Protein backbone atom coordinates (compact mmCIF):
# COMPACT_ATOMS: atom_id res chain seq x y z
CA UNK A 1 0.00 0.00 0.00
CA UNK A 2 1.42 3.36 -1.02
CA UNK A 3 0.82 6.39 1.14
CA UNK A 4 0.78 9.97 -0.07
CA UNK A 5 1.01 12.38 2.84
CA UNK A 6 -0.32 15.87 2.29
CA UNK A 7 2.72 17.49 3.84
CA UNK A 8 5.04 15.56 1.52
CA UNK A 9 3.40 15.83 -1.87
CA UNK A 10 0.37 18.07 -1.83
CA UNK A 11 -0.40 21.70 -2.38
CA UNK A 12 -2.96 23.17 -0.08
CA UNK A 13 -5.79 25.38 -1.22
CA UNK A 14 -7.05 26.84 2.05
CA UNK A 15 -10.74 27.38 1.50
CA UNK A 16 -13.90 27.67 3.52
CA UNK A 17 -15.54 25.60 0.80
CA UNK A 18 -17.66 28.37 -0.76
CA UNK A 19 -17.33 27.17 -4.37
CA UNK A 20 -17.80 23.55 -3.33
CA UNK A 21 -20.88 24.39 -1.27
CA UNK A 22 -22.43 26.35 -4.15
CA UNK A 23 -21.86 23.48 -6.56
CA UNK A 24 -23.39 20.85 -4.33
CA UNK A 25 -26.28 22.99 -3.20
CA UNK A 26 -28.09 21.69 -6.27
CA UNK A 27 -27.74 18.11 -5.02
CA UNK A 28 -30.31 16.65 -2.62
CA UNK A 29 -28.71 15.84 0.70
CA UNK A 30 -29.73 13.88 3.79
CA UNK A 31 -31.68 15.54 6.57
CA UNK A 32 -31.10 15.10 10.28
CA UNK A 33 -33.67 12.30 10.24
CA UNK A 34 -31.92 10.13 7.65
CA UNK A 35 -31.55 6.63 9.04
CA UNK A 36 -29.43 4.84 6.46
CA UNK A 37 -25.91 5.42 5.24
CA UNK A 38 -26.97 5.06 1.60
CA UNK A 39 -26.85 7.67 -1.09
CA UNK A 40 -23.15 7.16 -1.79
CA UNK A 41 -22.39 5.25 -4.94
CA UNK A 42 -22.26 5.54 -8.74
CA UNK A 43 -26.02 6.03 -9.08
CA UNK A 44 -25.91 9.19 -6.96
CA UNK A 45 -23.10 10.99 -8.84
CA UNK A 46 -23.52 14.52 -10.09
CA UNK A 47 -20.96 16.35 -12.20
CA UNK A 48 -19.05 19.00 -10.28
CA UNK A 49 -19.10 22.07 -12.51
CA UNK A 50 -16.60 23.91 -10.30
CA UNK A 51 -13.85 21.25 -10.43
CA UNK A 52 -13.41 19.88 -13.99
CA UNK A 53 -13.29 16.08 -14.13
CA UNK A 54 -14.82 15.64 -10.68
CA UNK A 55 -18.13 14.18 -9.60
CA UNK A 56 -19.99 14.87 -6.38
CA UNK A 57 -21.27 12.07 -4.18
CA UNK A 58 -23.66 12.68 -1.30
CA UNK A 59 -23.59 10.62 1.87
CA UNK A 60 -26.38 10.22 4.38
CA UNK A 61 -25.75 9.77 8.06
CA UNK A 62 -27.01 6.79 10.00
CA UNK A 63 -28.58 7.76 13.32
CA UNK A 64 -29.18 4.23 14.61
CA UNK A 65 -25.77 2.62 14.36
CA UNK A 66 -23.84 2.33 17.66
CA UNK A 67 -20.26 3.47 17.16
CA UNK A 68 -17.42 2.22 19.32
CA UNK A 69 -14.90 5.00 18.84
CA UNK A 70 -12.03 6.28 21.01
CA UNK A 71 -13.08 8.36 24.04
CA UNK A 72 -16.76 7.91 23.37
CA UNK A 73 -19.75 5.91 24.58
CA UNK A 74 -20.74 4.08 27.73
CA UNK A 75 -18.19 2.99 30.35
CA UNK A 76 -18.78 -0.25 32.28
CA UNK A 77 -17.36 -0.22 35.81
CA UNK A 78 -15.61 -3.01 37.71
CA UNK A 79 -13.10 -3.47 40.51
CA UNK A 80 -10.68 -6.19 41.55
CA UNK A 81 -11.55 -6.35 45.25
CA UNK A 82 -13.48 -9.09 47.03
CA UNK A 83 -16.80 -7.56 45.99
CA UNK A 84 -16.40 -8.55 42.34
CA UNK A 85 -18.78 -11.28 41.23
CA UNK A 86 -17.15 -14.46 39.95
CA UNK A 87 -19.73 -14.44 37.15
CA UNK A 88 -19.08 -10.84 36.10
CA UNK A 89 -18.87 -11.42 32.36
CA UNK A 90 -21.66 -13.98 32.33
CA UNK A 91 -23.89 -11.50 34.16
CA UNK A 92 -23.17 -8.62 31.80
CA UNK A 93 -23.35 -10.74 28.66
CA UNK A 94 -26.86 -11.83 29.66
CA UNK A 95 -28.16 -8.67 31.27
CA UNK A 96 -31.86 -8.08 31.92
CA UNK A 97 -33.32 -4.92 30.43
CA UNK A 98 -36.78 -3.48 29.99
CA UNK A 99 -36.68 -4.85 26.44
CA UNK A 100 -35.30 -8.30 27.19
CA UNK A 101 -31.83 -9.77 27.68
CA UNK A 102 -28.98 -7.70 26.26
CA UNK A 103 -25.19 -7.84 26.10
CA UNK A 104 -23.86 -4.75 27.87
CA UNK A 105 -20.67 -4.64 25.78
CA UNK A 106 -22.85 -3.99 22.73
CA UNK A 107 -23.44 -0.58 24.31
CA UNK A 108 -20.24 0.00 26.31
CA UNK A 109 -16.78 -0.12 24.76
CA UNK A 110 -14.70 0.70 27.84
CA UNK A 111 -14.11 -1.30 31.04
CA UNK A 112 -13.25 1.06 33.88
CA UNK A 113 -11.24 -0.44 36.74
CA UNK A 114 -11.36 1.72 39.84
CA UNK A 115 -9.82 0.26 42.94
CA UNK A 116 -7.26 0.29 45.71
CA UNK A 117 -3.62 0.89 44.93
CA UNK A 118 -2.92 -1.95 47.39
CA UNK A 119 -4.82 -4.43 45.23
CA UNK A 120 -2.84 -3.51 42.12
CA UNK A 121 0.53 -3.38 43.93
CA UNK A 122 0.39 -5.85 46.87
CA UNK A 123 4.16 -6.02 47.37
CA UNK A 124 6.98 -3.72 46.41
CA UNK A 125 7.85 -4.34 42.76
CA UNK A 126 4.99 -6.79 42.28
CA UNK A 127 2.05 -5.75 40.11
CA UNK A 128 -1.30 -7.44 39.69
CA UNK A 129 -1.18 -7.40 35.88
CA UNK A 130 2.09 -9.34 35.74
CA UNK A 131 2.29 -13.12 35.55
CA UNK A 132 4.33 -13.41 38.77
CA UNK A 133 1.46 -11.99 40.84
CA UNK A 134 -1.28 -14.49 41.72
CA UNK A 135 -3.21 -12.81 44.53
CA UNK A 136 -7.01 -13.08 44.34
CA UNK A 137 -7.13 -9.47 43.13
CA UNK A 138 -4.53 -10.19 40.46
CA UNK A 139 -6.55 -13.15 39.21
CA UNK A 140 -9.64 -10.97 38.99
CA UNK A 141 -7.72 -8.30 37.11
CA UNK A 142 -6.43 -10.78 34.56
CA UNK A 143 -9.93 -12.20 34.12
CA UNK A 144 -11.33 -8.73 33.51
CA UNK A 145 -8.57 -7.74 31.09
CA UNK A 146 -8.98 -10.93 29.09
CA UNK A 147 -12.75 -10.54 29.01
CA UNK A 148 -12.46 -6.94 27.84
CA UNK A 149 -10.10 -8.00 25.07
CA UNK A 150 -12.53 -10.69 23.90
CA UNK A 151 -15.29 -8.06 23.70
CA UNK A 152 -13.15 -5.42 21.96
CA UNK A 153 -13.32 -3.16 24.99
CA UNK A 154 -10.52 -0.87 26.08
CA UNK A 155 -9.52 -0.32 29.70
CA UNK A 156 -9.60 2.73 31.96
CA UNK A 157 -8.13 3.14 35.46
CA UNK A 158 -8.42 5.06 38.71
CA UNK A 159 -6.24 4.16 41.70
CA UNK A 160 -7.51 5.21 45.13
CA UNK A 161 -5.00 5.68 47.97
CA UNK A 162 -7.25 7.08 50.70
CA UNK A 163 -8.73 4.45 53.05
CA UNK A 164 -11.39 6.64 54.68
CA UNK A 165 -14.82 5.01 54.38
CA UNK A 166 -13.06 1.77 53.36
CA UNK A 167 -12.77 -1.52 55.22
CA UNK A 168 -9.11 -2.16 54.50
CA UNK A 169 -5.99 -0.15 53.72
CA UNK A 170 -6.11 1.15 50.15
CA UNK A 171 -2.40 2.04 50.16
CA UNK A 172 0.00 -0.95 50.24
CA UNK A 173 1.27 -1.83 53.70
CA UNK A 174 4.90 -1.74 52.52
CA UNK A 175 4.54 2.03 52.04
CA UNK A 176 3.55 2.48 55.69
CA UNK A 177 6.28 0.08 56.82
CA UNK A 178 8.85 2.11 54.87
CA UNK A 179 8.05 5.09 57.10
CA UNK A 180 5.50 7.07 55.13
CA UNK A 181 3.56 9.45 57.34
CA UNK A 182 -0.18 8.98 57.52
CA UNK A 183 -3.22 8.88 59.77
CA UNK A 184 -5.76 6.37 61.05
CA UNK A 185 -9.54 6.60 60.78
CA UNK A 186 -12.38 4.33 61.75
CA UNK A 187 -14.74 2.65 59.28
CA UNK A 188 -17.33 0.82 61.34
CA UNK A 189 -15.39 -1.58 63.52
CA UNK A 190 -12.27 -1.40 61.32
CA UNK A 191 -9.36 0.97 61.83
CA UNK A 192 -7.70 1.94 58.54
CA UNK A 193 -4.58 3.90 57.57
CA UNK A 194 -4.16 6.52 54.84
CA UNK A 195 -0.97 8.28 53.72
CA UNK A 196 -0.40 12.00 53.52
CA UNK A 197 0.12 12.75 49.80
CA UNK A 198 2.78 15.37 50.60
CA UNK A 199 4.97 12.76 52.30
CA UNK A 200 8.15 12.06 50.27
CA UNK A 201 8.20 8.33 51.04
CA UNK A 202 4.61 7.99 49.84
CA UNK A 203 5.47 9.95 46.69
CA UNK A 204 8.49 7.77 46.00
CA UNK A 205 6.50 4.52 46.00
CA UNK A 206 3.45 6.00 44.29
CA UNK A 207 5.59 7.33 41.47
CA UNK A 208 7.30 3.96 41.09
CA UNK A 209 3.87 2.31 40.75
CA UNK A 210 2.56 4.80 38.18
CA UNK A 211 5.73 4.49 36.09
CA UNK A 212 5.44 0.70 36.15
CA UNK A 213 1.81 0.98 35.13
CA UNK A 214 2.64 3.28 32.23
CA UNK A 215 5.32 0.91 31.00
CA UNK A 216 2.61 -1.65 30.21
CA UNK A 217 -0.49 0.51 29.76
CA UNK A 218 0.60 3.70 28.00
CA UNK A 219 -0.92 2.04 24.97
CA UNK A 220 -4.00 3.44 23.20
CA UNK A 221 -4.75 0.02 21.74
CA UNK A 222 -5.32 -1.26 25.29
CA UNK A 223 -6.35 1.78 27.32
CA UNK A 224 -9.03 4.41 26.76
CA UNK A 225 -8.04 6.78 29.57
CA UNK A 226 -6.46 7.05 33.02
CA UNK A 227 -7.64 9.22 35.91
CA UNK A 228 -4.53 11.12 36.84
CA UNK A 229 -4.85 11.61 40.59
CA UNK A 230 -6.90 9.36 42.89
CA UNK A 231 -6.24 11.35 46.07
CA UNK A 232 -8.76 12.36 48.71
CA UNK A 233 -12.04 10.68 49.58
CA UNK A 234 -13.12 8.10 47.01
CA UNK A 235 -10.27 9.20 44.75
CA UNK A 236 -12.17 12.34 43.76
CA UNK A 237 -9.56 14.87 44.94
CA UNK A 238 -11.53 16.55 47.71
CA UNK A 239 -11.20 16.18 51.50
CA UNK A 240 -7.43 15.81 51.07
CA UNK A 241 -5.37 15.86 54.27
CA UNK A 242 -1.73 17.01 54.19
CA UNK A 243 1.01 16.41 56.76
CA UNK A 244 2.39 19.94 56.48
CA UNK A 245 -1.06 21.36 57.18
CA UNK A 246 -2.68 18.91 59.59
CA UNK A 247 0.37 18.05 61.69
CA UNK A 248 2.56 21.16 61.38
CA UNK A 249 -0.11 23.82 61.02
CA UNK A 250 1.25 25.38 57.84
CA UNK A 251 -0.94 27.18 55.26
CA UNK A 252 -2.69 24.78 52.92
CA UNK A 253 -2.27 26.32 49.48
CA UNK A 254 1.53 25.95 49.04
CA UNK A 255 1.47 22.26 49.99
CA UNK A 256 -1.72 21.59 48.09
CA UNK A 257 -0.35 23.19 44.91
CA UNK A 258 3.00 21.42 45.21
CA UNK A 259 1.26 18.03 45.46
CA UNK A 260 -1.07 18.90 42.59
CA UNK A 261 1.86 19.95 40.40
CA UNK A 262 3.81 16.81 41.27
CA UNK A 263 1.02 14.35 40.51
CA UNK A 264 -0.17 16.08 37.34
CA UNK A 265 3.42 16.29 36.08
CA UNK A 266 3.85 12.59 36.76
CA UNK A 267 0.79 11.36 34.89
CA UNK A 268 1.12 13.76 31.97
CA UNK A 269 4.75 12.75 31.43
CA UNK A 270 4.36 8.97 31.59
CA UNK A 271 0.98 8.76 29.82
CA UNK A 272 1.82 10.64 26.65
CA UNK A 273 -0.19 8.33 24.37
CA UNK A 274 -3.26 7.75 26.56
CA UNK A 275 -5.62 10.57 27.67
CA UNK A 276 -5.45 11.49 31.37
CA UNK A 277 -8.27 13.09 33.36
CA UNK A 278 -8.61 15.25 36.45
CA UNK A 279 -11.78 15.85 38.44
CA UNK A 280 -13.45 19.21 38.24
CA UNK A 281 -15.34 20.51 41.25
CA UNK A 282 -15.11 23.64 43.40
CA UNK A 283 -12.81 22.20 46.11
CA UNK A 284 -10.06 20.49 44.11
CA UNK A 285 -7.26 19.32 46.39
CA UNK A 286 -8.55 21.12 49.48
CA UNK A 287 -9.16 19.57 52.89
CA UNK A 288 -12.80 20.67 52.69
CA UNK A 289 -15.44 18.04 52.14
CA UNK A 290 -17.95 20.66 50.96
CA UNK A 291 -19.30 24.06 51.96
CA UNK A 292 -22.63 24.76 50.31
CA UNK A 293 -22.46 27.17 47.40
CA UNK A 294 -19.07 28.51 48.46
CA UNK A 295 -16.02 27.63 46.41
CA UNK A 296 -12.24 27.76 46.56
CA UNK A 297 -10.81 30.66 44.56
CA UNK A 298 -7.68 28.73 43.50
CA UNK A 299 -9.46 25.65 42.16
CA UNK A 300 -10.10 26.96 38.66
CA UNK A 301 -6.49 28.09 38.29
CA UNK A 302 -5.13 24.72 39.40
CA UNK A 303 -7.35 22.75 37.06
CA UNK A 304 -6.26 25.08 34.27
CA UNK A 305 -2.65 24.17 35.01
CA UNK A 306 -3.49 20.49 34.59
CA UNK A 307 -5.31 21.10 31.31
CA UNK A 308 -2.26 23.00 30.04
CA UNK A 309 -0.24 19.82 30.66
CA UNK A 310 -2.65 17.78 28.55
CA UNK A 311 -5.30 16.77 31.06
CA UNK A 312 -8.96 16.32 30.20
CA UNK A 313 -11.89 16.68 32.62
CA UNK A 314 -14.22 14.41 34.57
CA UNK A 315 -16.77 14.83 37.34
CA UNK A 316 -18.10 12.10 39.63
CA UNK A 317 -21.39 13.47 40.98
CA UNK A 318 -23.57 14.25 37.98
CA UNK A 319 -27.21 14.48 39.01
CA UNK A 320 -26.45 15.37 42.65
CA UNK A 321 -27.71 18.93 42.91
CA UNK A 322 -25.53 19.78 45.90
CA UNK A 323 -22.27 18.63 44.33
CA UNK A 324 -23.00 19.43 40.68
CA UNK A 325 -24.45 22.90 40.63
CA UNK A 326 -23.90 26.40 39.30
CA UNK A 327 -20.13 26.49 39.83
CA UNK A 328 -19.56 23.17 38.03
CA UNK A 329 -21.90 24.08 35.15
CA UNK A 330 -20.29 27.45 34.64
CA UNK A 331 -16.80 25.98 34.87
CA UNK A 332 -17.31 23.25 32.29
CA UNK A 333 -19.09 25.62 29.90
CA UNK A 334 -15.78 27.49 29.55
CA UNK A 335 -14.09 24.28 28.33
CA UNK A 336 -16.79 23.25 25.86
CA UNK A 337 -15.19 21.61 22.80
CA UNK A 338 -11.72 22.41 24.17
CA UNK A 339 -11.23 19.23 26.22
CA UNK A 340 -13.29 16.03 26.39
CA UNK A 341 -15.51 15.47 29.42
CA UNK A 342 -16.26 12.17 31.15
CA UNK A 343 -19.19 11.92 33.56
CA UNK A 344 -20.08 9.72 36.49
CA UNK A 345 -23.39 9.90 38.30
CA UNK A 346 -23.39 10.57 42.02
CA UNK A 347 -26.46 8.80 43.38
CA UNK A 348 -26.01 5.14 44.39
CA UNK A 349 -29.30 3.30 44.52
CA UNK A 350 -28.15 0.56 46.88
CA UNK A 351 -26.89 2.95 49.58
CA UNK A 352 -28.63 6.29 49.08
CA UNK A 353 -32.16 4.92 48.82
CA UNK A 354 -34.80 7.61 49.29
CA UNK A 355 -32.25 10.37 49.89
CA UNK A 356 -32.85 11.31 46.27
CA UNK A 357 -36.07 13.00 47.34
CA UNK A 358 -34.00 15.81 48.82
CA UNK A 359 -32.92 16.62 45.27
CA UNK A 360 -36.50 16.53 44.05
CA UNK A 361 -36.37 13.09 42.44
CA UNK A 362 -39.40 10.85 42.97
CA UNK A 363 -37.63 7.68 41.80
CA UNK A 364 -34.46 6.45 40.15
CA UNK A 365 -35.86 6.81 36.65
CA UNK A 366 -35.92 10.53 37.39
CA UNK A 367 -32.37 10.33 38.76
CA UNK A 368 -31.17 8.79 35.51
CA UNK A 369 -32.96 11.52 33.53
CA UNK A 370 -31.33 14.15 35.74
CA UNK A 371 -27.88 12.67 35.14
CA UNK A 372 -28.55 12.44 31.42
CA UNK A 373 -29.72 16.05 31.16
CA UNK A 374 -26.65 17.35 33.00
CA UNK A 375 -24.41 15.19 30.80
CA UNK A 376 -25.97 16.60 27.66
CA UNK A 377 -25.54 20.17 28.89
CA UNK A 378 -21.88 19.45 29.65
CA UNK A 379 -21.44 17.86 26.17
CA UNK A 380 -19.84 14.77 27.71
CA UNK A 381 -18.16 12.14 25.57
CA UNK A 382 -18.59 9.23 27.98
CA UNK A 383 -21.20 8.15 30.55
CA UNK A 384 -21.04 5.61 33.36
CA UNK A 385 -22.52 2.18 34.04
CA UNK A 386 -21.42 1.63 37.64
CA UNK A 387 -20.95 -1.76 39.24
CA UNK A 388 -22.68 -3.34 42.22
CA UNK A 389 -22.19 -6.96 43.23
CA UNK A 390 -25.95 -7.05 43.78
CA UNK A 391 -26.41 -5.92 40.21
CA UNK A 392 -30.21 -5.78 40.36
CA UNK A 393 -29.83 -2.93 42.86
CA UNK A 394 -27.04 -1.26 40.93
CA UNK A 395 -26.82 1.70 38.59
CA UNK A 396 -26.30 -0.36 35.44
CA UNK A 397 -29.48 -2.32 36.13
CA UNK A 398 -31.29 0.95 36.77
CA UNK A 399 -30.13 2.41 33.46
CA UNK A 400 -31.16 -0.68 31.49
CA UNK A 401 -34.50 -1.15 33.22
CA UNK A 402 -35.66 2.29 34.34
CA UNK A 403 -34.10 4.38 31.58
CA UNK A 404 -33.14 2.07 28.71
CA UNK A 405 -34.34 4.64 26.19
CA UNK A 406 -31.67 7.01 27.54
CA UNK A 407 -28.98 4.34 27.16
CA UNK A 408 -29.88 4.06 23.49
CA UNK A 409 -30.29 7.80 23.08
CA UNK A 410 -26.77 8.47 24.30
CA UNK A 411 -25.44 5.84 21.89
CA UNK A 412 -27.05 7.61 18.95
CA UNK A 413 -26.89 11.28 19.99
CA UNK A 414 -24.04 11.64 22.48
CA UNK A 415 -20.27 11.68 22.10
CA UNK A 416 -19.24 12.49 18.53
CA UNK A 417 -20.81 11.12 15.34
CA UNK A 418 -18.78 12.12 12.31
CA UNK A 419 -19.50 11.78 8.61
CA UNK A 420 -18.77 13.56 5.31
CA UNK A 421 -22.09 14.50 3.72
CA UNK A 422 -20.63 15.67 0.38
CA UNK A 423 -17.42 14.80 -1.42
CA UNK A 424 -16.13 15.82 -4.86
CA UNK A 425 -13.53 13.49 -6.39
CA UNK A 426 -12.02 12.93 -9.85
CA UNK A 427 -13.49 10.15 -12.00
CA UNK A 428 -10.12 9.52 -13.66
CA UNK A 429 -6.58 10.05 -12.37
CA UNK A 430 -3.18 10.04 -14.03
CA UNK A 431 0.30 9.60 -12.60
CA UNK A 432 2.25 12.83 -12.36
CA UNK A 433 -0.93 14.89 -12.38
CA UNK A 434 -2.54 16.84 -9.58
CA UNK A 435 -6.02 16.04 -8.37
CA UNK A 436 -8.38 18.16 -6.34
CA UNK A 437 -10.76 16.75 -3.71
CA UNK A 438 -13.41 18.84 -1.98
CA UNK A 439 -15.02 17.39 1.14
CA UNK A 440 -17.41 18.57 3.85
CA UNK A 441 -17.71 17.11 7.35
CA UNK A 442 -20.36 17.08 10.05
CA UNK A 443 -20.70 15.97 13.65
CA UNK A 444 -24.19 15.06 14.82
CA UNK A 445 -23.16 14.14 18.36
CA UNK A 446 -23.31 16.60 21.22
CA UNK A 447 -19.66 15.91 22.17
CA UNK A 448 -16.57 16.41 20.05
CA UNK A 449 -13.68 14.36 18.71
CA UNK A 450 -10.71 15.62 20.77
CA UNK A 451 -7.92 15.49 18.21
CA UNK A 452 -6.56 18.64 19.88
CA UNK A 453 -5.38 16.87 23.05
CA UNK A 454 -1.61 16.21 23.05
CA UNK A 455 -1.98 12.44 23.33
CA UNK A 456 -3.80 12.48 19.97
CA UNK A 457 -1.66 15.04 18.16
CA UNK A 458 -1.62 14.21 14.42
CA UNK A 459 -3.01 10.76 15.22
CA UNK A 460 -6.40 10.80 13.49
CA UNK A 461 -6.58 12.23 9.97
CA UNK A 462 -8.97 12.29 7.02
CA UNK A 463 -7.76 10.02 4.25
CA UNK A 464 -8.90 9.03 0.78
CA UNK A 465 -8.08 5.57 -0.49
CA UNK A 466 -8.03 3.73 -3.78
CA UNK A 467 -9.44 0.33 -2.90
CA UNK A 468 -8.81 -2.89 -4.78
CA UNK A 469 -12.16 -3.62 -6.44
CA UNK A 470 -11.74 -7.34 -5.76
CA UNK A 471 -11.14 -7.33 -2.00
CA UNK A 472 -11.85 -3.75 -0.80
CA UNK A 473 -8.33 -3.39 0.57
CA UNK A 474 -6.58 -0.02 0.22
CA UNK A 475 -3.87 0.01 -2.45
CA UNK A 476 -3.05 3.71 -2.22
CA UNK A 477 -3.88 6.20 0.53
CA UNK A 478 -3.87 10.00 0.34
CA UNK A 479 -3.81 11.63 3.80
CA UNK A 480 -5.15 15.16 4.07
CA UNK A 481 -3.20 16.71 6.92
CA UNK A 482 -5.24 19.90 7.17
CA UNK A 483 -8.68 19.00 8.65
CA UNK A 484 -8.94 18.56 12.41
CA UNK A 485 -11.92 16.55 13.64
CA UNK A 486 -11.93 18.60 16.85
CA UNK A 487 -13.28 21.50 14.79
CA UNK A 488 -16.43 19.60 13.81
CA UNK A 489 -19.20 20.40 16.24
CA UNK A 490 -22.92 19.90 16.01
CA UNK A 491 -24.68 22.43 13.82
CA UNK A 492 -21.60 23.57 11.89
CA UNK A 493 -20.32 21.81 8.76
CA UNK A 494 -16.66 22.26 7.80
CA UNK A 495 -15.50 22.27 4.16
CA UNK A 496 -12.01 21.60 2.81
CA UNK A 497 -10.18 21.47 -0.51
CA UNK A 498 -7.30 19.02 -0.85
CA UNK A 499 -4.88 19.20 -3.80
CA UNK A 500 -2.32 16.45 -4.18
CA UNK A 501 -0.21 14.75 -6.83
CA UNK A 502 -0.78 11.18 -7.98
CA UNK A 503 2.43 9.14 -8.01
CA UNK A 504 3.09 5.45 -8.63
CA UNK A 505 -0.52 4.31 -9.02
CA UNK A 506 -0.91 1.28 -11.27
CA UNK A 507 -3.26 1.60 -14.23
CA UNK A 508 -6.71 0.11 -13.80
CA UNK A 509 -9.96 0.53 -11.97
CA UNK A 510 -10.23 1.27 -8.25
CA UNK A 511 -12.92 2.27 -5.78
CA UNK A 512 -12.66 5.67 -4.14
CA UNK A 513 -13.15 5.49 -0.37
CA UNK A 514 -12.88 7.84 2.56
CA UNK A 515 -12.18 7.33 6.24
CA UNK A 516 -10.50 8.73 9.33
CA UNK A 517 -7.26 6.85 9.78
CA UNK A 518 -4.88 6.29 12.67
CA UNK A 519 -1.54 7.51 11.35
CA UNK A 520 0.26 5.65 14.15
CA UNK A 521 -1.07 2.33 12.82
CA UNK A 522 -0.07 2.55 9.15
CA UNK A 523 -3.26 4.39 8.26
CA UNK A 524 -5.72 1.80 9.40
CA UNK A 525 -9.18 3.17 10.09
CA UNK A 526 -9.07 4.75 13.54
CA UNK A 527 -12.51 6.35 13.88
CA UNK A 528 -15.68 4.83 12.47
CA UNK A 529 -18.09 7.07 10.60
CA UNK A 530 -21.78 7.48 11.35
CA UNK A 531 -22.82 5.73 8.14
CA UNK A 532 -23.90 2.19 7.42
CA UNK A 533 -24.14 1.22 3.75
CA UNK A 534 -21.09 0.67 1.53
CA UNK A 535 -18.66 0.38 4.44
CA UNK A 536 -15.89 -2.20 4.15
CA UNK A 537 -15.08 -4.62 6.94
CA UNK A 538 -12.07 -2.43 7.74
CA UNK A 539 -14.23 0.70 8.04
CA UNK A 540 -13.63 2.49 4.72
CA UNK A 541 -16.69 4.21 3.23
CA UNK A 542 -16.84 3.30 -0.46
CA UNK A 543 -17.82 6.13 -2.80
CA UNK A 544 -17.52 5.38 -6.54
CA UNK A 545 -15.30 3.74 -9.14
CA UNK A 546 -12.31 5.62 -10.55
CA UNK A 547 -9.99 4.83 -13.46
CA UNK A 548 -6.22 5.27 -13.14
CA UNK A 549 -4.21 5.82 -16.33
Enumerate the predicted regions with their spans.
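Aromatic-lined substrate-binding rim segments of carbohydrate-active enzymes
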Residues: 100-185, 256-275
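Aromatic- and acidic-residue-enriched segments that line the glycan-binding/catalytic groove
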Residues: 164-188, 238-250, 292-299
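N-terminal secretory signal peptides that target proteins for export/translocation
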Residues: 1-11
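Bacterial Sec-dependent N-terminal signal peptides
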Residues: 2-3, 21-55
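Catalytic cores of secreted or luminal carbohydrate-active enzymes
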Residues: 368-425
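Catalytic-core regions of glycoside hydrolase
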Residues: 48-95, 149, 228-235, 241-391
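Extracellular/luminal regions of secreted and cell-surface proteins that mediate adhesion/ECM remodeling
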Residues: 412-549
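Active-site groove signature of glycoside hydrolases
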Residues: 182-247
